[in-house]
Amino acid sequence: MTEFHHIPIMLGEVLELLAPERGGIFVDGTLGGGGHSEGILKRLTDGRLYGIDRDGEAIAAASERLKPFGDKFKAIRGNFFDMQSLLANEGVTGVEGILLDLGVSSYQLDTPERGFSYHEEAPLDMRMDDRANLSAYDVVNGYSHGELTRIIRDYGEERYAAKVASAIVREREREPINSTTKLADIIKYAIPAANRREGPHPARRTFQAIRIEVNGELAELDKAIRGAHDLLNPGGVMAVITFHSLEDRIVKQAFKAFEHPCTCDPKAPICTCGKKPTAEILTKKPIVPGVDELEYNPRSRSSKLRAIKKL
């Protein structure tokens, strides 16, 4: 079993935005290995932090790591999409700060048996929650050519989505595709040789697409962001770290709607819709990792940090 470690991305920037030293209730909606939570708890002199994660192994590892903080921390197994109801069960209806660090964790990538990595031989799984029914095996071996093309194109932004889908369907007709490395090889040889030699691993985009489909990562992200916004007390801050353009676009558009909700014709002399801003965007441009962080944590390469403050 791989040790559950977590190098928190842009920790200093996150803490500066959330300012947990203010006290009150904070939420880490994507607990993972607990790196960000530990940073928050060290500054949280008066208050409590709730950590949410659907991965049971993450809950266990983070709970052990954060045990020294005692009752200041409580882990909740669940999906941050359900944050409002999960916290309502704890009697919490308003919070001072929320962090969402989207995407797959280093532990999930580095644990071969979880099936997230194209570098290691493993069963096709990719479930962040092992209680879920849908796995990568089901997607790869059960989805139609059209469905595969759609998710690989839309969720992976893969230029050769149709070619990759055709190769998957052709190979699975011979025998089921049941391992990560077999799938990675199929993808690799479906992509033109000239393109295989450029950039990251040729399977990266397709694996991302399948993972997003299995875990429903984008299906209700906008709704989840709005629910988290509603939980914030006036003056409360939400910080969100994204890892690809699909996530970032959803977060950016949601934040913009909080700051500029007016639906009137832009040419209208005055606003008549009556919709008022509910939050201020604190990051006019997304914050990205600095050179030093990229050196010691190369997985932070594609990350972007955005934040809002509730009015």
Provide a role label for each language-model segment.
Residues 1-311:
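S-adenosyl-L-methionine-dependent methyltransferase catalytic core, i.e., the SAM/SAH-binding region
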